[in-house]
């Protein structure tokens, strides 16, 4: 019997142990890096058992991969795209309290959601021992494998649910403690000989991490009533009052408009056709004449969905940060939160710190990796004012980092640390958020408070994850396939890149190998690369598409990988569309 089976390396282990037959495989949850090895060890007689509520994520994965809601406008994390590429047949399903026997071992199923909505643990009682196979609830004493799997919304979508499943995780871990296990055996992680200490340490760390997150969270502005138990805490930053906006600005939806003295308009973002209607009304009223420029703050769908129609309606020059442009010009190449299929025509990709004149205003663009890594900031100087348009990165309550998939990095001059230092240097008279009607600003003391908070988090999260830098546990997309999705034709050769971000302070070796469908009868040789510290590099593969490939199919190409000797399994995937 096996419990979980993450990758093909299990076959080597079985051979060393002279095990030739696998009778049963029990799975704690459906994630591919926990399951994909099953195709290398199972035969027709192997009985596969899974959590009852996750059966569809084993037996019917094709529905997941073909459903557009799991590809575009991604606001939910459950189920996660760490899904098998191809369905497997399930023999049995299990729910809380089910018992089974294997030899003289009694196995009891415990429903332990947290890492996924329906993950289970298995209590093994044999020879007087009580051992729990706990899936990915815990990695080691005080540690978890990653943070982003706990993204879960208490209200609305999962997008706003940073560490949102920490309560269910705590309940599940308390349940395990109540079973008085002698050992915990995680799927990713080390065998834990003191479960009580390991669990208590983990939950104390998670609670402290959440408190530090909330202390400067922009979400407190949008939903102040949701956090009453954190009100008036001395170590939480007070929420600042708003400021009146200058008379030459207009705000509709997520769009800010600057109107010059000659009545020309400079528009930022267009997430809804209603914005186009509002601009047409301003033209009818004579408040503005023509739209001459469009600035795109970031790639999220509520900021770009209507840009193609906007560009058809108004003949204007479109600018955006060069890193933002990578996404909005080729959205099919990415699978990241709030991604829109809308393709934006960008006339000019701005460099960090690049300036230009627009009527009486001086515009200066910055790469501004705040709410998301793919984000720009714009300083507008004129009429004796310094206005900073921060996209969605700030509110008067603090920073917008409540979706772990947005790539909010920790570190000096990185992520929000970089953004806050830039604002401190520029000292704008007004700061603007695309979702907030009024302006605001930060005091020097508030900026220092937020910078200190981020430094504290870096130390806290380093303890929480089994990595040498916390960004590996926080940045879900530190490894990605590029393009994520591409159209392929029979008989052609296509390129697939696997990109790795080395968050460490020393070089790291990355190794990977795409896993092609067995019917293709093609094996791609694994490749490795040394990645320099604090850089992103890529491994390129050229893949031959079979001449007899079926048309109108979405083919999932998982990529097996390791990082500096640590096996990650089929950690990422790409999509080929025929």
Feature roles, as predicted:
Residues 516-522:
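Short, solvent-exposed loop/linker segments at beta-strand-coil boundaries, enriched for Pro/Gly
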Residues 530, 544-551:
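Short, surface-exposed loop/turn segments at beta-strand-coil junctions that are enriched for proline
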Residues 7-101, 274-277, 282-356:
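Active-site HxH/HxHxD metal-binding segment of metal-dependent hydrolases
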Residues 272, 502-507, 547-549, 565:
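Short, acidic/polar linear motifs in exposed loop/turn regions
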Residues 147-256, 262, 417-511, 523, ...:
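Accessory terminal helices/loops
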Residues 529-537:
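Short proline/glycine- and polar residue-rich coil/turn motifs
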Residues 2, 99-102, 106-197, 201, ...:
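Metallo-beta-lactamase
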Residues 548-578:
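Terminal connector regions
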């Amino acid at each position: 019997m096996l419990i979980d089976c993450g990758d093909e390396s299990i076959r080597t282990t079985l051979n060393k142990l002279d095990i030739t037959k696998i009778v049963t495989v029990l799975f704690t949850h459906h994630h591919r890096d926990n399951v994909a090895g099953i195709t290398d060890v199972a035969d027709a007689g192997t009985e596969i058992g899974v959590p009852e509520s996750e059966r569809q994520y084993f037996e019917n994965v094709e529905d997941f991969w073909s459903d557009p809601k799991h590809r575009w406008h991604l606001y939910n994390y459950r189920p996660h795209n760490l899904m098998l590429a191809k369905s497997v047949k399930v023999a049995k399903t299990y729910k809380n309290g089910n018992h089974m026997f294997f030899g003289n071992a009694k196995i009891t199923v415990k429903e332990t959601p947290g890492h996924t909505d329906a993950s289970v643990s298995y209590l093994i009682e044999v020879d007087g021992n009580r051992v729990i196979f706990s899936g990915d609830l815990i990695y080691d004493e005080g540690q978890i494998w990653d943070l982003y799997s706990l993204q879960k919304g208490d209200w609305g979508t999962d997008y706003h649910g940073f560490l949102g499943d920490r309560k269910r995780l705590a309940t599940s871990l308390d349940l395990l403690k109540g079973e008085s296990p002698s050992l915990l055996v995680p799927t990713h992680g080390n065998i834990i000989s003191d479960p009580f200490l390991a669990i208590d340490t983990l939950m104390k760390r998670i609670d402290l991490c959440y408190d530090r997150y909330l202390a400067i969270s922009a979400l407190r502005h949008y939903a102040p009533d949701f956090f009453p138990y954190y009100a008036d805490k001395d170590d939480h930053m007070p929420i600042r009052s708003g400021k009146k906006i200058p008379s030459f600005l207009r705000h509709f939806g997520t769009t800010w408009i600057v109107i010059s003295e000659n009545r020309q308009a400079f528009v930022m973002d267009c997430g809804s056709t209603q914005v186009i209607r509002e601009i047409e009304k301003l033209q009818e009223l004579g408040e503005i004449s023509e739209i001459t420029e469009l600035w795109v703050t970031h790639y999220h769908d509520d900021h770009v969905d209507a840009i193609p129609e906007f560009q058809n309606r108004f003949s204007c020059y479109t600018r955006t940060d060069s890193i933002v442009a990578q996404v909005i010009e080729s959205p099919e190449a990415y699978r990241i939160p709030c991604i829109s299929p809308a393709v934006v025509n960008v006339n000019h990709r701005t460099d960090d710190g690049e300036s230009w004149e627009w009527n009486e205003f001086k515009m200066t663009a910055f790469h501004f990796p705040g709410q998301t890594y793919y984000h720009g900031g714009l300083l507008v100087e004129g009429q004796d004012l310094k206005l900073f348009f921060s996209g969605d990165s700030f509110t008067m309550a603090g920073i917008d980092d409540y979706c772990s998939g947005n790539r909010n990095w920790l570190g000096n001059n990185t992520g929000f640390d970089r953004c806050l230092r830039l604002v401190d240097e520029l000292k704008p008279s007004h700061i603007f958020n695309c979702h907030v009607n009024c302006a605001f600003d930060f005091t020097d003391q508030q900026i220092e408070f937020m910078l200190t908070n981020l430094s504290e988090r870096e130390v806290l999260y380093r303890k929480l994850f089994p990595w040498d830098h916390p960004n590996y546990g926080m940045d879900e997309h530190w490894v990605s396939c590029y393009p994520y999705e591409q159209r392929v034709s029979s008989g052609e050769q296509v390129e697939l890149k696997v990109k790795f971000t080395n968050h460490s302070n020393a070089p790291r070796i990355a190794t990977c190998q795409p896993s092609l469908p067995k019917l293709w009868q093609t094996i791609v040789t694994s490749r490795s690369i040394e990645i320099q510290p604090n850089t992103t590099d890529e491994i390129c593969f050229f893949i031959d598409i079979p001449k007899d490939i079926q048309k109108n199919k979405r083919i999932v190409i998982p990529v097996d990988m390791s990082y500096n000797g640590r096996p990650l399994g089929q950690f990422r995937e790409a999509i080929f569309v025929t």
